[in-house]
Amino acid sequence: MTFVFDHPLIKDKLTRMRKIQTESTKFRDNLKEITQLMAYEVTKDLELDRIEIETPITKMLGYKLKEKIVLIPILRAGLGMVDGLKELIPTASIGHIGIYRDEETAQPKEYYCKMPANLTNGNAIILDPMLATGGSASKAIEIIKTYRPKTISFICLVAAPEGLKEIEKNHPDINIYVAALDEKLNEKYYIVPGLGDAGDRIFGTK
């Protein structure tokens, strides 16, 4: 399933991120806020346990998240999305995965992977601001599937149609959440109109 957001706050904040004049601090702030806005849809089907609590007035049955949640940023740009979700889900664990493109074969290769033990039978949420060709994201999903999570969701801010089709083709069982579906990839595989190199803009390394 692919869900493309249509929300005025997301559109406003994403426009600010796209501007070439936006400095790194503001870029990170808007990335965090958009991630939090997207979290409402991403987490709406999580299961709950009933628990008894005591309010200042009386006892009652409340709710507690039942699911094990693992946030998995694709290094390095995905790191900019972690804090927003971690604030909303403080019990979430965090894994990390690094993918690079082999210059000779043009195929994505894993260079780093560290996952928490509770990923098995848990709910994996993969984070990456950009979905361009879909190669790195598809490879990350393939690796994460070996840990046998209960569900896998992929969150990105800006996607090219080519990248979206790649994931839908290779992983039709994955839920994909996109803040904006852009026009295309250019000859250098940058998303058009896009927002530039998200990693450089997050960390100020342009």
Curated annotation (Swiss-Prot):
User: GO MF terms on file?
Assistant: GTP binding; magnesium ion binding; uracil phosphoribosyltransferase activity
The record's catalysed reaction(s) read: UMP + diphosphate = 5-phospho-alpha-D-ribose 1-diphosphate + uracil
**What pathway is this protein a component of?**
Pyrimidine metabolism; UMP biosynthesis via salvage pathway; UMP from uracil: step 1/1
Renumbered to this chain, the signal peptide range is: none
Record-listed 5-phospho-alpha-D-ribose 1-diphosphate binding positions: 76, 101, 128-136, 197
Q: Name one GO biological process term.
A: uracil salvage
Q: How is its activity regulated?
A: Allosterically activated by GTP.
Enzyme Commission identifier(s): 2.4.2.9
SUPFAM superfamilies in alphabetical order? PRTase-like (SSF53271)
Cofactor, free-text remark? Binds 1 Mg(2+) ion per subunit. The magnesium is bound as Mg-PRPP.
Q: Which parts of the chain span the membrane according to its record?
A: none
Mention any Pfam family matching this sequence.
UPRTase
Q: Which UniProt keywords apply?
A: Allosteric enzyme, Glycosyltransferase, GTP-binding, Magnesium, Nucleotide-binding, Transferase
Binding annotation for uracil? 191, 196-198
InterPro entries per the record? PRibTrfase_dom, PRTase-like, Upp_B, UPRTase/APRTase, Ura_phspho_trans
Cofactor(s) listed: Mg(2+)
Which family does the entry's similarity section mention?
Answer: Belongs to the UPRTase family.
Biological role: Catalyzes the conversion of uracil and 5-phospho-alpha-D-ribose 1-diphosphate (PRPP) to UMP and diphosphate.
Q: What is this protein called?
A: Uracil phosphoribosyltransferase
GN (gene name)? upp
